[in-house]
C-alpha cells in the first residue's frame, strides 16, 4: 500500500485554503491510485480557523482507500512524525510526500529520518510555485537545524 502524504500550508491570513496548499492538494490528486491511503496534514494557525487538514479534506475529490487527517502537525518535523505514524498504521511500503518544490528536499529528509529503520520508500512529488522571499529565508534558517531535527525525528516514534 502507498501513503500519499499532503503537507499543509498557510500564511495565517485567511480561513480559506491557501493557494499553495490547494496546489499541493491538486498534485496529490494527480498522484493517487485506487487503494492508496491519503494523509492530509496541517493545524489551525488561529483559534477561529479550521485546521489545514480539514480544509484539504473538504476540497479533496479523488478516490482513495482511506483518508487520514493529522490536525496536530505544526511544523515540518511534526509533519514528518505524523507521516511516519500514518505509514506504520496503514502498513505503507511507499510514502509519496507532496509539498512545494522549495520545501521538498528538507521535508523528505525529515520524513526519511522519521521512517528510519523501516523499509518504507519515500518518493517526493512537488508543485512548482515559486517560493516567496520569506519562504526562502525560512528554508535557509531551517536547513541549519536539519541535522538536529533529523536525529529528533529518527528517535521519536
What kind of feature is each model-predicted range?
Residues 1, 156-157:
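Actinobacteria-biased recognition of intrinsically disordered, low-complexity terminal regions
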Residues 1-136:
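A structural signal for short, hydrophobic/glycine-enriched beta-strand patches
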Residues 132-156:
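A transmembrane-helix-recognition feature enriched in membrane-embedded lipid enzymes
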